[in-house]
Design a protein with these regions (language model features):
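Secondary-structure end/capping motifs
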Residues: 234-318
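Sec/Tat signal peptide C-region and signal peptidase I cleavage site
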Residues: 23-29
Length: 339
């Protein structure tokens, strides 16, 4: 196995019913909130902290009744995400790529959402290629499959190619939403290389594709975050704090090597992968240099600035570039004691 496969970098929504809040750790004395958490992906390892929080009782301890609501009806992420945004009245908090909030003409245009905690710092994405492509130079004249033009995965792929001497136009970029459809393009022969997440990347490895680079090599980012509507957040701050405390406890649990076997069980539950594959996925999380999973949900403003700068570099955002505060609000993580 290519050792570079072990060098890498990992969303949902909520509706809560009002109630009187009590201090952390006193769930028996407080009224429970039903938290409807909508997701636009299936079997995604980004749900690891939430699953661990459920399995280990961290949501219960904080008085949270966690109920996922899935926006995956069509299997096409852009379509499902459009449906999600149109269903504003069915959720209050969301797990989403930070970049989605930044897109000037994106699906969240005109909304009032802000990130309050981090789900995944650097993305666990692999730039893979068929066996005859040994170096980036071999990509010249080939077709590379990536997400949308404004997706940070596409942008970091472009940055990686530029770092290795390729110019715009040297490689044809075919945009396909979703890692599994990109795997299909690779296996069909229509695409020579592409960027894939876990666990879809394993199907590419099984088909003979190999890793050219990990996207983290393009530099640190803040990839996936929990977002809330600012107006709703102003009147539900303690609910947000409880949620952050529960997922922060889960992240600390995941980082503790003594809990590996329990974390593997959670990963198997989410991804429906065999235990051996779940352990392989988690190996990327355990490699500190990849900085995939936050220590406890904290937001790295330096990484936010880097993500904004990446959007500026490729013309998605025009200057002067906005400050991080336009997209993130640290107050809730601070109140939860994780920031």
């Amino acid at each position: 196995m290519d050792t570079r496969r072990f060098r890498s970098a990992m969303v949902g929504l909520v509706v809560l019913a009002p109630a009187t809040l009590a201090p952390a750790g006193s769930a028996t004395a407080q009224q429970t909130y039903t938290l409807r958490y909508a997701v636009d992906t299936e079997r995604n390892i980004n749900g690891l902290a939430q699953t661990v929080a459920e399995r280990q009782g961290f949501f219960t301890r904080e008085g949270i009744n966690f109920q996922p609501v899935r926006f995956v009806a069509t299997g096409n992420r852009p379509t499902d995400r459009t449906a999600l945004v149109a269903s504003r009245d069915t959720f209050d908090m969301a797990r989403m790529q930070l970049s989605v909030l930044m897109e000037p003409e994106g699906r969240f245009k005109g909304t009032n959402y802000v990130a309050v905690s981090s789900v995944a710092n650097n993305p666990a994405y692999f730039l893979v290629a068929r066996p005859d492509i040994k170096t980036f130079a071999d990509l010249k004249g080939k077709t590379l499959t990536e997400p949308s033009p404004s997706d940070p995965i596409t942008l970091t792929a472009r940055k990686l190619m530029e770092t290795h001497g390729l110019k715009d136009g040297d490689v044809e970029i075919k945009t396909i939403a979703g890692s599994q459809p990109r795997v299909d393009c690779l296996k069909s022969g229509a695409c020579a290389a592409g960027s894939l997440s876990q666990p879809s990347v394993f199907a590419a490895f099984d088909a003979g594709f190999h890793t050219l680079a990990m996207h983290i090599e393009a530099g640190p980012l803040l990839y996936v975050v929990d977002i809330v509507d600012r107006s709703w957040a102003e009147t539900h701050s303690e609910v947000i704090v409880r949620y952050i405390r529960a997922t922060a406890a889960a992240m600390r649990f995941i980082h503790d090597p003594r809990n590996l076997d329990e974390v593997v069980k959670a990963a198997v539950e989410i991804t429906h992968q065999p235990e051996s594959r779940a352990r392989e996925m988690l190996s990327y999380f355990q490699d500190a240099k990849n900085d995939v999973l936050p220590k406890q949900g904290e937001i790295d403003t330096t990484a936010v600035k880097a993500t904004i700068a990446l959007f500026g570099q490729y013309g998605i955002l025009k200057g002067p570039l906005p400050p991080p505060e336009r997209f993130v609000d640290l107050r809730y993580a601070q109140m939860a004691g994780v920031q």
